[in-house]
Design a protein with these regions (language model features):
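A short, structural micro-pattern
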Residues: 30-35, 75, 87-89, 118-120
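Residue-level detector of functional hotspots within protein domains
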Residues: 25, 63, 67, 79-81, ...
Length: 185
């Protein structure tokens, strides 16, 4: 194994969550929303500094301020990251580390959801990389990246259909045609 240079937090939709998530908010605030105040990484003997985090999308529905990715490392529980207005859609936060976590080091992740009502995540995935280049969040998610990393000739029919669907769901030129379908979700 290799040292860990960054983490990615993916917030994922799920039909079992309010408004398909990715958050669990259901009685106050926008249904399906979440609000991540702080994200930290620690091992037995130290806390690992996160530098220059980025996100694929950010917007806060309640209160003032922006939804900058850097809010999750500022030590202020009243600031944070959310994807308000994008319920039922996947987004991600990329968190590069100032120094790599050595290979085979056990570590833990702590996420603080600090609002005056319940706004935790309902479905998420955390992945890591050992890439030495400082990774940044992209508009597409991990599944799209995995398919795009292969040669087009080696992609299966299902993978190509997945890419087509992703394109049609995300390209702004198709927004008008998507609206009736999006309204049904």
């Amino acid at each position: 194994t290799a040292p860990i240079t960054a983490l990615r937090l993916e917030v994922l939709p799920d039909d079992r969550l309010p408004e398909r998530g990715p958050g669990r908010c259901y009685y106050e605030g926008r249904k399906g929303d979440f609000f991540l105040s702080e994200f930290s990484v620690a091992s037995k003997d130290r806390k690992w500094a996160i530098v220059n985090p980025t996100h694929s999308y950010g917007k806060i529905s309640v209160g003032g301020g922006g939804a900058n990715a850097s809010n999750v490392i500022d030590g202020d529980g009243s600031s944070g990251w959310s994807t308000s207005g994008q319920t039922g859609k996947a987004h991600h936060l990329v968190l590069p580390l100032k120094e790599p976590i050595p290979a085979n080091t056990k570590f833990s992740v702590q996420m603080l959801f600090e609002r005056h009502f319940v706004v935790s995540l309902g479905r998420f995935r955390i992945s890591v990389t050992s890439d030495l280049k400082s990774p940044v969040a992209k508009k597409h998610g991990a599944e799209v990246e995995a398919v795009l990393a292969h040669k087009p000739s080696s992609a299966s029919k299902e993978q190509m259909n997945f890419l087509r669907r992703h394109y049609l769901e995300s390209d702004p030129r198709w927004k008008k045609q998507r609206q009736p379908i999006d309204a049904l979700r």
